[in-house]
Swiss-Prot record:
Keywords: Membrane, Transmembrane, Transmembrane helix. The chain crosses the membrane at residues 29-49, 76-96, 97-117. One of its GO terms (cellular component) is membrane. The lineage of its organism: Eukaryota, Fungi, Fungi incertae sedis, Microsporidia, Unikaryonidae. This is Uncharacterized membrane protein ECU09_1950. It is a multi-pass membrane protein. Its main location: membrane. Belongs to the DP1 family. It is found in: Membrane. PANTHER family: HVA22-LIKE PROTEINS.
Length: 179
């Protein structure tokens, strides 16, 4: 309980709750945490709360790192990895709703994962990088010419399809004229 009391000391609103309601800070913190967990698990507010916490906690640390004259390499790496993972999870939410609906407690798991991965003190971003991302072969994401080459390939493909469609349209129009 001493550890919980120390954490509760960092949250000013818990002082007001303790004075007005005569509830100890650590119990108020536990109650609020439990209430938030129930809301995440049992209501449609789960995605909103999860995304909000997933943004606010690391955003503050990201701003601190960005304002440093010489940020530590590990700090910058941690935040880059976190925002990349956050983007992937948010994309999963947005585009794979049908799949995610079959994963029990998805937003609860995402909530705790983001609380672990976001703050620098847990080093979640570094752990993810060292154990997963650093092991991805470079050839998977570096190609001759890099991004420029991939964009050129995509542009050429779109151009080919567009030309093909225009040619079909011309053939149809010319066949109508001959009829």
């Amino acid at each position: 309980m001493d550890c919980l009391r120390k954490q509760a000391e960092k949250i000013p609103i818990l002082d007001a709750i303790e004075k007005r309601m005569n509830i100890r800070k650590e119990y108020a913190l536990l109650g609020i945490s439990f209430f938030c967990l129930v809301i995440i698990m049992a209501t449609s507010l789960g995605p909103l709360i999860t995304s909000t916490v997933g943004i606010i906690v690391p955003l503050q640390e990201t701003l601190v790192i960005l304002r440093q004259v010489n940020p530590k390499k590990d700090e910058a790496k941690h935040m880059l990895v976190f925002w990349m993972v956050f983007g992937i999870l948010t994309s999963l939410d947005a585009y794979s709703g049908a799949i995610i609906s079959f994963i029990p407690l998805w937003y609860t798991m995402k909530f705790f994962f983001l609380l672990w991965a976001g703050p620098l003190k847990f080093r979640g971003g570094i752990i993810i990088y060292d154990n997963i991302l650093a092991r991805i072969p470079e050839k998977w994401y570096r190609e001759e010419g890099g991004i420029e080459h991939a964009v050129k390939k995509a542009t050429d493909a779109v151009k080919t399809v567009a030309e093909s469609e225009f040619n079909k349209k011309d053939v149809i129009e010319s066949s109508k004229k001959t009829d």
